[in-house]
Amino acid sequence: MFVDIAKIYVKAGDGGDGIVAFRREKYVPAGGPAGGDGGKGGDVIFVADRELNTLLDFKYKRHYKAQNGERGGPNNMHGKDGEDLIIKVPVGTVIKDAETGEIIADLSREGDRAIVAHGGRGGRGNSHFATSTRQVPRFAEVGEKGDELWVILELKVLADVGLIGYPNVGKSTFLSVATNARPEIANYPFTTKYPNLGIVYISEGESFVLADIPGLIEGASEGAGLGHQFLRHVERTKVLIHIVDVSGSEGREPVEDFIKINEELKKYSPELAQKPQIVAANKMDLPDAQAYFELFKEEIEKMGYEVYPVSAATGMGVREVLKRAYELLKQQKAAENVEEDAKPRTFVYYKKKDVKPLTIRKENGVYVVEGTVVEKVARNIVLNDHDSFRYFQNFLNKLGVFDKLREMGIQDGDIVRILDVEFEYYE
């Protein structure tokens, strides 16, 4: 089974908590705060690996989580950072944000990396909060949460040469003769629902990957049938072998078949129609094909294409087509800047986060304060003593929260809520 799309959940590690600690050595009589910072959470990183060729594993495991950072230690010891989670995917995998559809990365080269979820920052230990007026801070920060998101993995098969054509023209039979692949072969539309891959061996040290691209139909570029799925797999091939049933056994006209398929390629992507294309006039073992071949060959050659008579059922002419495809493939690869393409790249994705402005509303007698900045501080500071609460109050005052509360008519003893933190207001 070839699996080319998967949806998975990834979660970066949370940052470790900072701690409250003080120096207690015998010869340090006035030991100050010495709480260490928490470690950073691990990132989630996708890496392209040419040893893989399907996304099948992601159908069975859909949740992935990187390691959390560790808590800080005494004597300003920094907590250990969480290990990054490396997720290997086949070369040719496109990663998208499932919520927005935004393309995060196109991992088309061996070793390409994409950092899609960033680990949370470690919380600061109490030594960071010492001031001239607060020399013994008894509070610290908790670590920040790591990024989390659902992503869609989409594999565009990386075959060198693709077999294209209408359903039931003999592509799967051609592939089975050309390689050791054993595709499902039957006489019905959409016989091949996933690309079948095989290795074609030309001679020692000379080979290429051949893919049977699922059958196209008229309207595929608009998504008819399984059109978009099928056309997606053609994009990465360098050479196309266009299989045409020259016998007309399916009740269609061979030249029209050829023209319609190329029109669909051009509509979907003009670049596809420009790829080198060999035409294999298949089913030459049938009498009708032999009678029609010369006329077909003449019409197609007028359009500038090479035509080869073949019979996938008997193997006749298949080897000649494969050798010619390999020659064209070498020409295409030589034309590319191989050195530049070989360098792996790193993609870094930061999911856009909604920034909420500071707002205050009265709800059932409680003043509810909301906003990205104020909520972040309320979430990160452990409010468990006078020092930490005083720090929090000073922060709210600098942010202008208390001024706005007074404008709204707050009275002593009224309740203020920020996230799950509630306190009574007093001047």
Swiss-Prot record:
Residues that bind GTP: 165-172, 190-194, 212-215, 282-285, 311-313
Keyword Ribosomal protein: no
EC number(s) from the headed UniProt entry: 3.6.5.-
Required co-factors: Mg(2+)
Annotated ranges, domain Obg: 1-158
Gene Ontology molecular function: GTP binding; GTPase activity; magnesium ion binding
Matching InterPro entries: G_OBG, GTP-bd, GTP-bd_Obg/CgtA, GTP-bd_prot_GTP1/OBG_C_sf, GTP1-OBG_CS, GTP1_OBG_dom, GTP1_OBG_dom_sf, OBG_GTPase
CDD domains, per database record: Obg (cd01898)
Predominant location category: cytoplasm
UniProt keyword annotations, A-Z: Cytoplasm, GTP-binding, Hydrolase, Magnesium, Metal-binding, Nucleotide-binding
The OCT domain, residue ranges: 347-427
Function recorded in the entry: An essential GTPase which binds GTP, GDP and possibly (p)ppGpp with moderate affinity, with high nucleotide exchange rates and a fairly low GTP hydrolysis rate. Plays a role in control of the cell cycle, stress response, ribosome biogenesis and in those bacteria that undergo differentiation, in morphogenesis control.
Family (UniProt): Belongs to the TRAFAC class OBG-HflX-like GTPase superfamily. OBG GTPase family.
Description of how the protein assembles with itself and partners: Monomer.
Protein name listed in UniProt: GTPase Obg
UniProt source species: Caldicellulosiruptor bescii (strain ATCC BAA-1888 / DSM 6725 / KCTC 15123 / Z-1320) (Anaerocellum thermophilum)
